[in-house]
């Protein structure tokens, strides 16, 4: 595990008067003037958010652009597992902290509560639903007195992002080693992208069912992240010797696989590929990619249309 965090430096930051916006962002008022980057993305992406932000107490948070740091806290699996949780709860640092958690996040990812219970003292945890009404809490915002968090001390935003990913990989690899019995990988897994309900409009691969039918003949199993709890998905990926998956939040499950396995991403030919390619490279997976084509033409599909994977994988 130490190999993943070699040559990178982190500092444990303590914040006071933290406002948490569930499903959006955590905004921080640092107690230190150190200009370390808490970047999971560049500051410029959030200018509009910061300029429109207001809270009940002017002392709660600075609205000056350069003084505010943030981290994604979306219930999207990638943002939670890579950009948020390991930075908040790595190495058992927050057992005595008071923190308020949106219960909807735990409900959405069955099994996550048990994982967090190893790193947090739940006697100090307050749970809340999406609608909140409390003193010093505005609608949909949670107020926390203190919070500790790891941040990269790299002043370069891109390198800080890489540092965060290395820390996250190390965190989850350590978790898997401590909580799952050693096993020689044997499964072949296909991770689909959910097309149920409102997510139907976000379908990317137009022939994923057809792809899986072909892969079944090669002994692949289906992993639908919306149909199994988190620990089941973890176990399946930990036992996998090969993973094929459609680009989307479900591919975050490669974090739980063992280094060196084969991983093939099905995606558009654009920068989206880099999200999971970078994780795969950190983990030293045998990375492959198959770019989606237009349905009736052998040219690359654009993000505005469904892509189709043709030929064998």
Please identify what each model-predicted range represents.
Residues 1-313:
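The feature primarily captures lumenal catalytic ectodomains
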């Amino acid at each position: 595990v130490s190999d993943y965090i070699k040559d990178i430096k982190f500092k444990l930051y303590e914040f006071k008067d933290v406002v948490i916006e569930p499903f959006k962002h955590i905004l921080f008022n640092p107690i230190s003037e150190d200009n370390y980057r808490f970047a999971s993305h560049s500051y410029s992406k959030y200018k509009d958010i910061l300029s429109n932000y207001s809270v009940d107490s002017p002392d709660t948070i600075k609205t000056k652009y350069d003084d505010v740091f943030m981290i994604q806290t979306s219930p999207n699996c990638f943002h939670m597992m890579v950009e948020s949780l390991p930075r908040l709860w790595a190495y058992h640092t927050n057992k005595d902290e008071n923190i308020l958690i949106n219960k909807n996040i735990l409900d959405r990812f069955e099994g996550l509560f048990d994982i967090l219970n190893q790193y947090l003292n739940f006697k100090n945890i307050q749970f809340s639903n999406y609608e909140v009404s409390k003193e010093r809490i505005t609608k949909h915002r949670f107020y926390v007195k203190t919070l500790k968090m790891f941040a990269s001390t790299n002043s370069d935003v891109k390198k800080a992002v890489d540092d965060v990913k290395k820390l996250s990989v190390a965190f989850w690899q350590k978790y898997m080693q401590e909580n799952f019995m050693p096993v020689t990988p044997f499964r072949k897994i296909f991770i689909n992208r959910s097309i149920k309900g409102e997510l139907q409009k976000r379908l990317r691969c137009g022939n994923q069912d057809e792809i899986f039918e072909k892969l079944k003949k090669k002994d692949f199993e289906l992993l639908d992240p919306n149909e199994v709890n988190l620990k089941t998905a973890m176990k399946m990926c930990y036992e996998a010797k090969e993973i094929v998956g459609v680009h989307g939040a479900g591919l975050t499950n490669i974090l739980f696989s063992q280094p060196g396995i084969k991983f093939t991403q099905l995606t558009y030919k654009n920068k989206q590929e880099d999200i999971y390619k970078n994780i795969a490279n950190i983990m030293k997976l045998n990375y492959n990619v198959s770019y989606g084509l237009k349905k009736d033409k052998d040219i690359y599909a654009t993000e505005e249309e469904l892509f189709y994977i043709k030929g064998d994988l």
